[in-house]
């Protein structure tokens, strides 16, 4: 069972300030989720074949084939900022 103290600890680990109301609400929600998992644990799955994909899709990959592409000049033609033949992006600090 998840207590309000557990929720406060989780909140501190995530660096999230929780109000007392939120702490109580989240404790109830966590316990509700865990109760649902307990119900799932009780489901009889004898005779049910394990599956990895519910809808049975297989990998649908295509060959990686190089096609026609733009020249460098065509690529940078509409760029707002360019420098020495390259697109110049904003400085990120």
Swiss-Prot record:
Keywords on record: ATP-binding, Ligase, Nucleotide-binding, Protein biosynthesis
Keyword Protein biosynthesis found: yes
SUPFAM superfamilies linked to this entry: Glu-tRNAGln amidotransferase C subunit
Annotated coiled-coil segments of the chain: none
Signal peptide bounds: none
GO molecular function: asparaginyl-tRNA synthase (glutamine-hydrolyzing) activity; ATP binding; glutaminyl-tRNA synthase (glutamine-hydrolyzing) activity
Catalytic activity: L-glutamyl-tRNA(Gln) + L-glutamine + ATP + H2O = L-glutaminyl-tRNA(Gln) + L-glutamate + ADP + phosphate + H(+); L-aspartyl-tRNA(Asn) + L-glutamine + ATP + H2O = L-asparaginyl-tRNA(Asn) + L-glutamate + ADP + phosphate + 2 H(+)
GO BP, sorted A to Z: glutaminyl-tRNAGln biosynthesis via transamidation; regulation of translational fidelity; translation
InterPro entries: Asp/Glu-ADT_sf_sub_c, GatC
Quaternary structure, from the entry: Heterotrimer of A, B and C subunits.
Homology family: Belongs to the GatC family.
Function of the protein: Allows the formation of correctly charged Asn-tRNA(Asn) or Gln-tRNA(Gln) through the transamidation of misacylated Asp-tRNA(Asn) or Glu-tRNA(Gln) in organisms which lack either or both of asparaginyl-tRNA or glutaminyl-tRNA synthetases. The reaction takes place in the presence of glutamine and ATP through an activated phospho-Asp-tRNA(Asn) or phospho-Glu-tRNA(Gln).
Name under which the protein is recorded: Aspartyl/glutamyl-tRNA(Asn/Gln) amidotransferase subunit C
Source species: Methanocella arvoryzae (strain DSM 22066 / NBRC 105507 / MRE50)
